[in-house]
Amino acid sequence: MVREAWDRSRNLLTRIAEAVGADVPSELSLVSFGSLARMEFTSESDVDWCLLVDGRADANHREVQLRVQEALHGIAGTKDPNPAGAFGALVFSHEVIHCIGGAQDMNANLTRRMLLLIESVELNDPAIDRPRSRVLRGILQRYFEEEPRFPEKQFFPQ
């Protein structure tokens, strides 16, 4: 069962990269989360994904999102993410990195940030310094390097 899910995941990652990799410009990362990122994809799994933008917003990003969505529809064995959920969308790095806690940190943003950290995979060429790696560094910097600048704010409660 585990080996079957691993093989199914590896196969699907390859098919997605072949189907959409060339359509994703270098300022975007096509990122998958959940069972596909954990290499546990089954016939019941959906494909949770986002297009991660780190930089200037561009009207063309929406077109890329629609092409990715269409390409994923064409890959046998894939199900769309929950339409009311946090996936299948454009995600902007500024919100993920800087809206931590408080009223601006909505459930979808928190979900994306946590899953980026613990279970995400780049679906396009990871050799290029894509937004995913920069955003991961940015999140970790916010969590761990910002604290020394605020000595009254203790990282670990006493």
Where are these regions (language model features)?
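N-terminal regions immediately upstream of nucleotidyltransferase
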Residues: M1-S26, A86-G88
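Alpha-solenoid helical-repeat scaffolds
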Residues: R3-W6, D58-R62
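Active-site nucleotide-donor binding segment shared across nucleotidyl transfer reactions
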Residues: T14-N60
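Conserved catalytic core of two-metal-ion nucleotidyltransferases
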Residues: A17-D23, N60-P157
